[in-house]
Amino acid sequence: GWEGQPRVSPDMKAYSKFDFQKSRIAVEVQFGHASFLGTDLLKFQMASYSNLDLIDFGVYITTTKAMQKFLTNQYGHNWDGSLNFEKVEKYLPYFKSAIQVPIYVIGIDV
């Protein structure tokens, strides 16, 4: 099964954890602030390269703008500054020189 909250590396402190991992696939789920994107992506890189060789690829899951709009209209949730699929799609190319591990991005939509 899936392991919850596995460390990026056995030698790293508690703050360096994935949300889930199974075999050599790491998963990050991010509905929070957009500023977490860089940190989340670097965790994939650290676990794949940097002499760790613990994963083959990462999966990054977030909401879409449409889902955020729906949740705002239905429940009044404030998404100001939050990450979404479209932001990941926009900023991911800027990380391509630093991130060599494949990352599959999933946007949860309505």
Regions found by a protein language model. Name each.
Residues 1-23, 35-42, 49:
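Active-site metal-binding core of divalent-cation-utilizing nuclease and nuclease-like domains
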Residues 47-54, 94-98:
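Arginine/glycine-rich "motif VI" loop of SF2 helicases in the C-terminal RecA-like domain
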Residues 50-56, 62-65, 70:
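Conserved acidic-Pro-Pro-aromatic motif
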Residues 64-110:
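Domain-level recognition of nuclease-like catalytic cores that cleave nucleotide substrates
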